[in-house]
């Protein structure tokens, strides 16, 4: 299994003037399938959607605390996490991004490359390679004697493989490798493997339901963390893209939502959140 993931790893909207529905429903002259996913995320996992050349996306992502706390924390309002993300399209198939999350004061840089696109009556899949590096700036040498800068670093690489099955249904697999130089569970390997499974079903012209699930493949037996399961809705109206969702993982960076999901759907320990994008 490790050899498989290593092989995969080394393979090479607030307001805007144009209605995004027109953009995503446009078919190119090369007969590519379009609009497999409306958002840059399925829910937690990256989708195969790309930012177009010379476009800049500003994405605000917000996750409230657990709704299980009830009125004490106003159903999670007092324990919110926010992530700000800037994504730029160098070309239609090359995106770069930089973000900052309040969860562990995490900074992240990422590179997203589209390797191949699904084409009608030809190639059946879109394949995108996503790579990221992050820094956990909340770690403090006063609390962790011997802490070095390298211990704050984490890395992730994913191969995103999607298929637009028909006008309503799109599916995606995301084999993932991620590495943390410092782990919170002693028995946990620094190098970790996961498989993301996700999909989108179009409900109306402007609404869709999205689901994704991450299967951690080498989680330590003593780990208190869970596999992330998320359910959300995408809404497009005018230049706005809203993603509303429930998930058992409050953090939004790859290493963190796959490695540190603390919620439990069976106990109602879940987090409500949203993403909103503006295109420049």
Q: What are the language-model segments listed below?
A:
Residues 4-5, 165, 202, 280:
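Small/flexible residues
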Residues 18-146, 153-157, 162-173, 177-181, ...:
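Transmembrane beta-barrel domains of Gram-negative outer membranes and organellar outer membranes
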Residues 168-217:
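A mid-sequence, solvent-exposed acidic-amphipathic segment
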